[in-house]
Amino acid sequence: YDEMETNTPQKKEQQIEKKSSSKYINYETVDKDSPKINIYNHKTGKTQQMDIEEYLYGVLSGEMPSDFNIEALKAQAVAARTYTIHKQENETSKHKGSAVCTDYTHCQEYKSYEELKESKGEEWIKSSYPKIKQAVNDTKGQIITYNGEPIVPLYFSTSSGKTENSEEVFSTEYPYLRSVDSPYDKYAPKYASTLKISNKDLESKLKSTYSDINITQNNLSSQIKILNRSDGGSV
């Protein structure tokens, strides 16, 4: 695999170095195409073996809209491949004898060719699927590493303009998953949303969770305040 090494020096700038490595999977010694991995299909309850790059076609199709810029799709392909290799190389993260599963709440979103054809239609298959395949093929074998090991690329759709430190969202602190400004998120389709809830409904929800809470819909504004924020600005 080609590794794109991330370093976290004392200064804020992060450096990325691309280098060649066959530590994890060497295409030349596996077969002429690419290595096979075991995937647990949570819909069928069965494990299937699949070419890793073919698997990534289905992941990329499910994780990112095909009308996004090709470079964004390539970046997503590298992140998804890195995630897959990390799961493959860490025994504790495997389940049901497989490296990954098709359940996006546990691993990554995955749509088979048949599912894509049924849900998106023939026109999408003809016009957009080739772009998905190009993004995967153009980055074939590329993963991101830190200190010589595949990183845990906990990617997500959209931030509020600044990402979070990993421990603010998950239980583990990773030196390469630090809060940074992400100003381009404002162009994302899901950047901002508004949810309106009545004082009565909020009171009901709070009391259903905290039965001993002393609060009423009449004094919400005086009893609710922001106590602290994360480095990323989240409440």
What are these regions (language model features)?
Residues Y1-V235:
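Conserved, single-site charged/polar hotspot
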